[in-house]
Amino acid sequence: LKPNQSRYWLNPNITDEASFHQEVHQVCEVYEVYEAAPALYENGIHVHSTDEMTGIQALSHKHEALPMVPGKVERREFEYERHGTSGLIASRHVVTGQIESPLIQPTRTELDFVQHVREVVLLHPEYQHIFITNQLNTHQSESLVRFVIDRGKLGLDEETIGVKGKSGILKSLATRKAFLENLAHLIRFVYTPKHCSWLNQIECWFSILVRRLLNKRSSFSSKEALEERIAQFIVYYNTHLAKPFKWTFDGKLLKV
């Protein structure tokens, strides 16, 4: 027993059995896509794990750290200066482990997300694509629906597409989500259930980014310097470290 230690825990709040079973099905679907990713890749279908990392702070220590000496650990300046924040929209190719088309900037609007998805698709424009992501509203937007229609050359008329909040595919978040999940599309989305960010492999890579670059030892003199360092780290990671994660379902963390 370690009474001095504790950890957060989220108890399930099951108010609707049907919705609960639907979310369980979603977990299984995401898992099945990960398992099938190598075979899908062989058949020209690319699987991407996609999300945003927001509020990345550009902090600089007021003074340089004092190096370790015999008998003393390294001493880092406690006070720091803020130089703004940025963000990152990124996809991780599930089979190759490569970080694809990172969008490093402060904003994360629905148009930003569509821009990122477009750039990822254009890396392999002749193939099909599956994006695993969460149910954020910008991931189920009108702009994304229209991109999938245009890119997939679905040839839908405006009456079928409808008007946001009123009719057709665009009527509601639910109708847009159903359209984006359509198995027949060249570009489709698989959504993780609420409180299941652990299912999204890009979250594990964000943790790598924090440990390797955005840690307490880091110091960034400006927002631009922060963004440049993130871009450089991604290039280094793709060149030297990228590999598929080994998925485990026995309570252990994903292993690189």
Explain the meaning of each model-derived region.
Residues A184-C196, E203-V256:
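C-terminal anion-handling pockets and recognition modules
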Residues M68-I130:
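Electropositive, glycine- and tryptophan-enriched low-complexity nucleic-acid-binding patches
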Residues G44-I45, Y127-Q128, L183-R188:
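Short glycine-/polar-rich loops that comprise or flank the Walker A/P-loop
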Residues R75-Y80, R151-Q201, S218-F220:
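RNase H-like polynucleotidyl transferase catalytic core
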Residues L1-R82, V256:
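Charge-mixed, compositionally biased segments that are often intrinsically disordered regulatory tracts
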Residues Y127-Q140, K164-S167:
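Acidic/histidine-rich, metal-coordinating catalytic segments
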Residues S49-D51, S91, G97, V117, ...:
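Mobile genetic element proteins and their domesticated derivatives, centered on retroelements
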Residues I56-A58, T138-E142, S197-Q201, L254-V256:
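Short catalytic/ligand-binding loop motif for oxyanion handling, primarily in non-cytosolic enzymes
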